[in-house]
């Protein structure tokens, strides 16, 4: 405006826009030229698409997608908005003015943010007034709003990643069968050897037993090592690495219980022989507590019990840690007994709580038997004849006494019990178990604790070895004599090497049924006598480990009469040239000695020799001549289980691979486990009437259901086992 000629005139009239918009507002109010309808709550608000799109990017996007057809109006559904709020907003678009109550203000502001009305979405209600939020806040809000979407995505991602982490956890648990054992094995690294057979033979019932024995076994806590041992038998390469990962999961599961049961046995027996166990399945012995039991279960599986894998059972047989297997089983069986009656407290005649009873018949028996099978695999360790001869008779007798009651109870509990009992008896009779324990670093302690510790550490393996080593052809074990021989040889090799693993017999019989002593039966030649004065004690712990311990503690003199086949449980060790089938619980002493020599704790008294071959003696009865209470106990035990077959003494053998199939007699016994009297609270207090095995001599071949000890061979005193 400097010069009229050159200057340009600039004129501004803010009212015009206002007037124009007011005119548009009138048109909107009257619905003239309106090409859009905004619907909410069933009502519609007319509007101009150009105005809507100019004031809100939200409407711009919507109208671009839904362009109005010529002559028709676009209908936009405004879900979630109140009609009054919508009207207020549209009025503001046309007039830039709005009058609302405080209650409506929040709705209008939220709707403005939803519809992205720029001049309203930045407002906020403060002190009854609508004021523009500071730009800082606005920026923050803007940042927060986009992040709002991000959080959603983040949430999605977060859950995804979380599931991924759990998935690995789930995946890791997926191999729980192996993983549990592994993890347990690592935990029980110290006790691998002790519990190795147990873990393999553990069945569900066995696991329950472990839970029972859990307290005592916890003290023995070396389940990780034991489990590792069985793991190695199953899968040596993987289990070693996995144990660390799985221990928590497995331990949380039954395996923890297994640890408890294993821990007691491992400290004593496996310290000495860790090398052999570790070299083979020892790394898994921690898990072995379970595995050992599973392996025994596998034997039962062979008999019809599927709780344990046959592979596991064989690992027990071949695993150099049969003692481990036996121990965990024993620990489980013993720990209850250890809690209540220790080996010292529980004397020959005493019978402690038998948790084996609680265990499912099939399951319990499976656990006991499977460790023997594993021992067969570990035969090299188990089959040390010198060690077998070395075991102290006293320990064997006491252990035998303790174990025999447990075996009887097993017979009562499950159809397979007869076989188990036979195996237990034979294992208990062999003096090897005590010897084996002494050989182990902890063996001396075990010898001292013969009833308590021997069961855990030495006897389980010793018994396992005997069982593995002495398959009865008459009993027809799955394992051929050649296979059994090879396994037995391996066991002997391991034993010579000083491995902790003992034959399944040890695992079957508790290393030291603490507080329980089972009469040990002498399966040795007629010249040998059972140790008298020892009474059957039913251990609270699982049958196999306890039984082994009882036999171990209880010195048994060799039978004067040749051992005769009683039940399929009797096994013939390769070491023994000929062995007669023993009663389900009895195993040839010679085999025990040779196989169980590794267990220094075995007493020579328990030595069982058979003048006649097992196969040929299927019909003959065992004769026990002994002044030992174990012999007495056994005689007394027989009457309650007068018909081992009837009583269901047959015990499914976890050592099917190692041993020939159990004779029909044993199986019959197992079929009638109920007939057997429950384990007596105290063997001493109660007497077990044992029919003369000689009288019932040749009750029948191994197939004959009932087997009776020979009263002439056994001690004069008879003990009646009361439930």
From Swiss-Prot:
Biased composition (Polar residues): 162-174, 195-205, 627-636
Main subcellular location of this protein, as a coarse class: nucleus
Compositional bias of kind Low complexity: 217-227, 271-286
Compartments in which it is found: Nucleus
Tissue: Expressed in testis.
BTB domain location: 34-102
Null allele phenotype: Mice are viable but show male sterility due to defects in spermatogenesis. Retrotransposons are derepressed due to DNA demethylation. Defects are caused by impaired piRNA biogenesis.
A single cellular component GO annotation: nucleus
A GO BP entry: transposable element silencing
Keyword Chaperone: no
SMART domains in the cross-refs: BTB
Pfam families: BTB
Keywords: Differentiation, Nucleus, Phosphoprotein, Spermatogenesis, Transcription, Transcription regulation
UniProt feature, compositional bias: Basic and acidic residues: 303-312, 327-336, 617-626
InterPro entries: BTB/POZ_dom, BTBD18, SKP1/BTB/POZ_sf
Post-translational modification Phosphoserine, affected residues: 414, 682-683
PROSITE patterns with a match to the protein in the record: BTB
Biased composition (Acidic residues): 713-723
Region (Disordered): 150-176, 188-350, 370-394, 603-637, 699-723
Function: Specifically required during spermatogenesis to promote expression of piRNA precursors. The piRNA metabolic process mediates the repression of transposable elements during meiosis by forming complexes composed of piRNAs and Piwi proteins and governs the methylation and subsequent repression of transposons, which is essential for the germline integrity. Acts by facilitating transcription elongation at piRNA loci during pachytene.
Protein name according to UniProt: BTB/POZ domain-containing protein 18
Taxonomic lineage of the native organism: Eukaryota, Metazoa, Chordata, Craniata, Vertebrata
GN (gene name): Btbd18
